[in-house]
Amino acid sequence: MASLQRKGLQARILTSEEEEKLKRDQTLVSDFKQQKLEQEAQKNWDLFYKRNSTNFFKDRHWTTREFEELRSCREFEDQKLTMLEAGRGVGNCLFPLLEEDPNIFAYACDFSPRAVEYVKQNPLYDTERCKVFQCDLTKDDLLDHVPPESVDVVMLIFVLSAVHPDKMHLVLQNIYKVLKPGKSVLFRDYGLYDHAMLRFKAGSKLGENFYVRQDGTRSYFFTDEFLAQLFMDTGYEEVVNEYVFRETVNKKEGLCVPRVFLQSKFLKPPKNPSPVVPGPGS
C-alpha cells in the first residue's frame, strides 16, 4: 500500500462513471429528517466515540510537515506557542504536537463530552500544558475558556465539514475572538469529489456537497471558492488555499483510491498602528 500526494488549485476531474453517479443522486433527505439530524448531532458524535473509542483515527504526525507555524517555536528555547485545536476529537493531533515540542501550550475543545473524557484519560494529558473542554463552537462562547486574542494559531482539522453549512460562519466568528491579530487558522478537511463523497449511496444527500453517513454523522465536501468566501466574509485574509490530492494504491488488489482534501491558511488581519499625532509646532 503506497500513497502519492500532489497539490493543486483546480478541483479533481471526475470520470464519466463518477459524473453519472452524482447526476443520478439528486434526491435530498426530507426536511423532517434533516432537522432531526441537526438536533441529534451531538448525540450522534458521542455515540461514534462510544463505538470507536480512541481507535478510529490515526495520530496525525503530518501537521508539522505541512504547517510551518507549528515548527516556529522550536527555533528558540524560550519561544512559546499557544494554540487552539478546535474540535480535536480524542487528541490525534494534540498529543503528537505536545510530545514533539515542550514549548506548546494548547487549548482544545470538542462537541462530544465523551471525546473530551477520552483525552483526559490519556497518559500524555497534562493540565500544565493543555486545557481541554467541551464546546459547541456554533453557540458556546470560546471566551468562557480562552482569553481574548491570546492564541497564536488555531487548528481546524477535519472539523468544519461536520457542521451544517448554514452555521459554519458561527465557528469562524467564535475562533476569531481568541486569535491574536496577525495570526493564522490552519485548515484541512474533505475536498470536492473526495472518494468518501463518491461512495455515498442514494438517499444520503442533504444539500449541495453535504451528506449524511449511516451513523447519523454528517460531512461537507469543500471547494476552494466556498471556503475562501466563508473565511473572508468573517474578516479573515486568504494566505494559502489549495487542494491536496492523494492516491492510495494497492498494487496487489489493483485498487487506486483518490482522496481529495482542502488545505488552507487564513490570517486574522494585524491591527493598524495608531496614527502618530503631530505635536505643537511640528
From Swiss-Prot:
Q: Which GO terms describe its cellular component?
A: cytoplasm; nucleus
Q: Which reaction does it catalyse?
A: cytidine(32) in tRNA(Ser) + S-adenosyl-L-methionine = N(3)-methylcytidine(32) in tRNA(Ser) + S-adenosyl-L-homocysteine + H(+)
Spans traversing the lipid bilayer:
none
Give the location in the cell. Answer: Cytoplasm; Nucleus
**Binding sites annotated in the UniProt record for S-adenosyl-L-methionine:** W45, Y49, G87, D110, D136, L137, I157
> Highest taxon of the source?
Eukaryota
Q: Name one GO biological process term.
A: methylation
In the Enzyme Commission scheme, what number(s) does this protein have? Answer: 2.1.1.-
Function summary: S-adenosyl-L-methionine-dependent methyltransferase that mediates N(3)-methylcytidine modification of residue 32 of the tRNA anticodon loop of tRNA(Ser), including tRNA(Ser)(UGA) and tRNA(Ser)(GCU). Interaction with SARS1/SerRS is required for N(3)-methylcytidine methylation.
Q: How does it assemble?
A: Monomer. Interacts with SARS1/SerRS; interaction is mediated via tRNA(Ser) and is required for N(3)-methylcytidine methylation.
Report the PANTHER family cross-referenced here: METHYLTRANSFERASE-RELATED, TRNA N(3)-METHYLCYTIDINE METHYLTRANSFERASE METTL6
Q: Which family does it belong to?
A: Belongs to the methyltransferase superfamily. METL family.
Q: What is this protein called?
A: tRNA N(3)-cytidine methyltransferase METTL6
Q: From which source organism is this entry? A: Pongo abelii (Sumatran orangutan)
Gene behind this protein? METTL6
